[in-house]
């Protein structure tokens, strides 16, 4: 891990140690000189011989009118002082400064020596490579990100509240994708908000959303020397989520003693091991054992991880007896050392561990697929990523059982001899899900296979699910092939009416009544979402919308502080603020937590600020999953 900066710092440290050693030696010599015995030479022998008296120079008379050729010159000898002739004077140490003993120096870590000798780095980047904090993010506007200056004139307090107040769990897959894009964009900080703190709030929300890789990219876009306390905290959480434990080491090296908590002490010691001081680091971790700093299981996992950096390679036995819960660093150290967490602990664990497993390359493929069954519905994994994962499972001959069977079904969904064979394989993948969320993840998985299905009457009964599967991956063009076959008032028709890029004629009240009469969802939720989406997209006239909303006993014009804020953001054409506020309005663990009023304002605001494609997908998803 040592780079050019570490090498230069090591040279400086050695030079400083030599200088410190010289001071120690010189101070010792002075003490010896003060306590030396009296001279044994006879009196006078230790005194320098007096210099002979110097003769006065003879006066020189200059004759008037004499020329330069006739003048006499007297050479004056140049006397140069002999080096060392002057009495040496020891440079005094500042008052209150104590020189460490040799034993203390030997016990110091490299970071402590750097701090003692004034070699502590102020940045993890050389001067020529340091980056501006003006725009922090990973997506420029020409790469699909939002406009950089969208928040420059906005209130920092409002933006902070929208980010910090979001718990990270959104009901909509497409809402999650949109918010991730907004958070990862290269943006100027809003007024009155430190750019590093702005990056911290975005990274922290991405971690809560399960987007560890995006969060890590955000914190890595800021030089460690510019970190604030909040950004340091967000970075620790991001590296824990991705199990990239040594990724935090540059931050710890620069921030040094900024924190003294147990987490920081353990991570600092682990980083010390990977900086080449393995023996001292392992000894320090040994002293932290016994539950004094971290729980015993966490200290053992940290020792196992740090031990990989040293030459000793000592064995560490991990015993899970008595461990009742999973924690972020416990999980990170477990998968980073190649271990599998106990199944009993993972059954009741939070979704963040499933999301982490789905993205972690060191986790077994079957465990990743199990995590993907949750991550895809949330919006963390794309359809292409799911297909790639199942393809790896199919290629592994040593994987058997349910996951092997599912990978074979996915292959049949693409390569079945007849459309009926392909449809049967797709249906088996859907129906094999244990709950609606997993079923929707399987729809994400089969999106491209669904797009290859022919539009035939024999598949009309599955058309709503086929369309929902295609729209889960944004394949609206493929889904619209079913428009001619879709019966007005059906679920297929409702999804396509919302997902279509444009619509010439507004939806009639008769079509809405037909959909309402066949709506079996709880409290007519699908009908509520349909009218909210159509009104937000402007695809139904106001009178028809008002009449249908009245029948459903909803008031789309009801105002709250949130509705006023997102409407004002749309009025000034601010897509970034609209996205952040839409994220606030989409929080929940299921579509039963979404209201038709919130959906209407979200779809309307997104459509007005140029995010019509996202608005259409969110509206169609709401009807499909409501």
Descriptions of predicted regions:
Residues 300-475:
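Long, internal scaffold/assembly segments composed of regular secondary structure
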Residues 33-101:
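N-terminal propeptides/low-complexity segments immediately following signal peptides
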Residues 192-199, 224-233, 258-267, 280, ...:
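Generic helix N-cap/helix-start motif at coil->alpha-helix transitions
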